[in-house]
């Protein structure tokens, strides 16, 4: 695996592959890799000749009081995991490389409406940061396909909308959430949880299953959502949001919507966890 923090090196390597007619997949990450990330890389290997991975803790997507400085940096372990998973190229830019003029003078990308609700409302500017860095990385790497986990469902939709709106010509592929045996969605932020909190955190998935099963059986969405909310709050969470939505546009679910997604964000102690569950009725 080649590792570089230099944009021109990354571009030259991708051009070399393309000159030989070889396909390129891309998996952008913030590092501190877990099995969910490794699954993305392995899935990418099934779909393209070469896999490029980026590791960049993006300051633009962190709010003023969020955990940018505390976010774990584990480059040595991440590099070995990516070698084992079959990645061909690792891009590790610095903030100076990505934002040479600083965040305030940086051109940005903003995806309206779908980026303004849920996590977009709770974390103002977050999806501007996500869309901007992903767009910039896409322009550097210029992959055929890019893979993202469905755990960050709203993020996945934001990126799909951006790619479509800006005619970037990249196929965006969502990969199912990887979960621990308890049902807890794998996340880098799980590392902030105590063992007891990790046990409690599995309640989120149970609440999502409860809501989905109730709605499938004909229960009113408001009633099912209230039951799920009670389960989450009683377990000790501070709920940010819990909503059943149209899976295509994140509008509140209507009676004739068939493809639905339940979105949830909640705090356990100081750790904010998100999850979702897609289902049809």
UniProtKB/Swiss-Prot annotation:
Any Pfam family matching the protein: Pantoate_ligase
Residues that bind beta-alanine: 61
Catalytic center residues: 37
Residues annotated as binding ATP: 30-37, 149-152, 178, 186-189
Pathway: Cofactor biosynthesis; (R)-pantothenate biosynthesis; (R)-pantothenate from (R)-pantoate and beta-alanine: step 1/1
Role description: Catalyzes the condensation of pantoate with beta-alanine in an ATP-dependent reaction via a pantoyl-adenylate intermediate.
Lineage, top ranks: Bacteria, Pseudomonadati, Pseudomonadota, Gammaproteobacteria, Alteromonadales
Protein residues bound to (R)-pantoate: 61, 155
Family assignment from sequence similarity: Belongs to the pantothenate synthetase family.
Any further remark recorded for this protein: The reaction proceeds by a bi uni uni bi ping pong mechanism.
GO MF, one annotated term: ATP binding
Top-level taxon in the UniProt lineage: Bacteria
Keywords (A to Z) from UniProt: ATP-binding, Cytoplasm, Ligase, Nucleotide-binding, Pantothenate biosynthesis
GO biological process, one term: pantothenate biosynthetic process
Reaction equation(s) it catalyzes: (R)-pantoate + beta-alanine + ATP = (R)-pantothenate + AMP + diphosphate + H(+)
Assembly behavior: Homodimer.
Name of the protein: Pantothenate synthetase
Keyword ATP-binding recorded: yes
A GO CC term assigned to this protein in UniProt: cytosol
The keyword ATP-binding appears for this protein: yes
Listed EC numbers: 6.3.2.1
Cellular localisation: Cytoplasm
């Amino acid at each position: 695996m080649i590792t570089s923090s230099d944009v021109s090196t990354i571009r030259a390597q991708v051009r070399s592959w393309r000159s030989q007619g070889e396909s390129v997949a891309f998996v952008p990450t913030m590092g501190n890799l877990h099995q969910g990330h490794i699954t993305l890389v392995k899935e990418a290997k099934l779909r393209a000749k070469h896999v490029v991975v980026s590791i960049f803790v993006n300051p633009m997507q962190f709010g003023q009081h969020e955990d940018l400085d505390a976010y774990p940096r584990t480059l040595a372990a991440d590099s070995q995991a990516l070698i084992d998973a079959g990645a061909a190229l690792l891009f590790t830019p610095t903030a100076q490389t990505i934002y040479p003029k600083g965040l305030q003078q940086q051109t940005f990308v903003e995806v309206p409406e779908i980026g303004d609700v849920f996590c977009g409302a709770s974390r103002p500017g977050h999806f501007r940061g996500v869309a901007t860095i992903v767009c910039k990385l896409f322009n550097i790497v210029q992959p055929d396909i890019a893979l993202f986990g469905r755990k960050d469902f709203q993020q996945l939709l934001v990126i799909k909308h951006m790619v479509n709106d800006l005619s970037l010509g990249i196929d965006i592929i969502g990969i199912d959430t990887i979960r621990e045996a308890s049902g807890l969605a794998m996340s880098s932020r799980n590392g902030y949880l105590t063992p007891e909190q990790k046990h409690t955190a599995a309640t989120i998935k149970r609440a999502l299953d409860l809501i989905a099963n109730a709605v499938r059986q004909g229960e009113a969405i408001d009633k099912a959502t209230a039951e799920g909310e009670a389960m989450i709050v009683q377990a000790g969470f501070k709920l940010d949001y819990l909503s059943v939505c149209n899976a295509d546009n994140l509008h509140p679910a209507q009676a004739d919507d068939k493809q639905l997604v339940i979105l949830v964000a909640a705090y356990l102690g100081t750790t904010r966890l998100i999850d979702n569950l897609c289902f049809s009725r």
